[in-house]
Design a protein with these regions (language model features):
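Surface-exposed loop/interface segments of Gram-negative outer-membrane beta-barrel transport/assembly proteins
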Residues: 1, 36-43, 47, 51-138, ...
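Short strand-turn segments of transmembrane beta-barrel domains in outer membranes
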Residues: 1-15, 28-41
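Outer-membrane beta-barrel channels and translocator barrels
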Residues: 9, 20-21, 57, 146-148, ...
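Short coil-to-beta-strand
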Residues: 21-25, 166
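Periplasmic plug
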Residues: 26-28, 63
């Protein structure tokens, strides 16, 4: 079928984990590639995760949780536009020829002419392409210190990076293409966010009485860069 497909879903994962008396860890890798019901509709992502917690001494514990992901965010699928001026492969005649006499894709499969000639996604697809997606690094680092007299201190910081890319081009060699549609579109942006948390806790039991007090300090920042 030139328009629809039996979408294939692929999801692969591998992981390892382990623990000792003082350290436990986990690491995983994954890849996903999903196809939709329409030709050209697809999504893919690569992801990984690492977690580690360690008891360094009787009074110090540290940990880290790191997530990485690179995923697509756009595709160029067969056009099924609903307006009468939109390209739509379903409007082609059953007798339309998608190839010319030399076996190459025919731009106008119903008549070979621009006027009422139909639409061939596969001919046009030779002249444009798209790369669009996100790369994300999410991290959390923490430490806990046990202090005398029932006091403890905990520190958490969570930096997050996100990169976005959008690269599209249409060749001027595409016959009868609109001058406004030809050319290149390039977009890039980066986000950097972080938040941190400092917590001091006092937990003490006096006879039948249990006292708990907590002091918390938090801070965060969001930064954004773009060439658009």
């Amino acid at each position: 079928d030139m328009v629809f497909q039996n979408g294939l879903r692929q999801d692969y994962n591998a992981s390892i984990s382990g623990a000792t008396e003082r350290v436990n860890y986990y690491f995983s890798l994954g890849y996903i590639n999903n196809e939709g019901a329409v030709q050209g509709n697809e999504y893919n992502a690569f992801r990984s995760n690492m977690k580690i917690n360690a008891k360094i001494t009787d009074w110090l514990e540290v940990g880290a949780n790191v997530n990485f992901q690179d995923r697509s965010d756009g595709d160029i699928q067969v056009s099924l536009g609903s307006n009468y001026w939109d390209n739509n492969m379903l409007r082609n005649s059953p007798y339309a020829s998608m190839y010319d006499n030399n076996g190459n894709y025919e731009q106008y499969p119903m008549s070979g002419l621009p006027t009422n000639g139909g639409y061939n996604y596969y001919f046009d697809r030779q002249y444009y392409d798209l790369e669009k997606g996100y790369t994300v690094l999410n991290t959390i680092f923490n430490a806990k210190i046990t202090l005398p007299a029932g006091f403890s201190y905990q520190f958490n910081i969570a930096p997050r990076y996100q990169w976005f890319y959008d690269r599209y081009w249409m060749s001027a060699d595409l016959p009868n293409a609109s001058a406004a549609d030809r050319g290149v579109n390039r977009g890039w942006s980066k986000n950097f966010d972080w938040n941190l948390n400092n917590t001091i806790t006092w937990d003490k039991i006096f006879g039948e009485h249990h006292f708990t007090a907590t002091l918390v300090q938090e801070a965060e920042e969001h930064r954004y860069w773009s060439d658009n």
